[in-house]
Regions:
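C-terminal motif of bacterial Sec signal peptides marking the signal peptidase cleavage site
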Residues: 13-16
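Short, low-complexity N-terminal intrinsically disordered segments enriched in polar/charged residues
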Residues: 18-71
Length: 179
């Protein structure tokens, strides 16, 4: 389901950048129930009803969490995360547990770095109107400098699910930068 959601969020981003408008017609009096005028080869298993109805405060909180990571401020980063958090790491590992346990994992990794530079290339607020769930998706390049001198750069695409002003699910996809 996470891969499907990733594909949907990427498709939504690409389509939202298009200046051409696609006409949709309402199939009922419910404003969230819309049918595409185009006969599509797939039906979304999660949802195809998206808006950008995520608060600017939630967007700022998510983007600030990246700044806190870059600055090594794990205490502030912790405040952005829910009490219970699910994380899908870019290496395929999964974490489902308490905020404090996640911060121990992230602190250990961040402590191995002397600096982190993030070039935030873009973001998109996404609200699943039928599921009533908000997300902030991000695209960025991160350059990590390890204390031993090694420098590693990669491009990332993250999905941050936001509930009650906190990140409760975080999924990360990584593509190494060419050397």
């Amino acid at each position: 389901m996470r891969k499907i959601f990733f594909c949907l969020s990427l498709a939504f981003f690409i389509l939202s950048c298009n200046n051409d408008t696609t006409k949709t017609t309402a199939t009922s009096t419910d404003s969230t129930a819309q049918k595409s005028a185009v006969d599509l080869p797939y039906t979304a298993s999660y949802t195809s009803n998206w808006s950008t109805d995520v608060s600017d405060a939630d967007l700022k909180m998510v983007l600030t969490s990246y700044k806190d990571w870059a600055d090594g401020n794990i205490a502030n980063l912790s405040k952005s995360m829910g009490d219970s958090v699910s994380v899908d790491f870019n290496n395929g590992d999964h974490f489902n547990g308490k905020n404090a346990d996640l911060m121990k994992i992230w602190s250990t990794y961040r402590d191995s770095l002397s600096s982190v530079a993030i070039d935030m290339e873009g973001w998109q607020k996404m609200y699943a109107t039928d599921k009533k769930e908000g997300f902030v998706v991000t695209w960025y390049k991160e350059t990590d400098t390890y204390k031993m001198g090694k420098v590693d750069s990669a491009y990332y695409h993250d999905i941050n699910q936001v509930k009650n002003g906190k990140i409760t699910w975080y999924s990360q996809y990584k593509r190494p930068a060419k050397k």
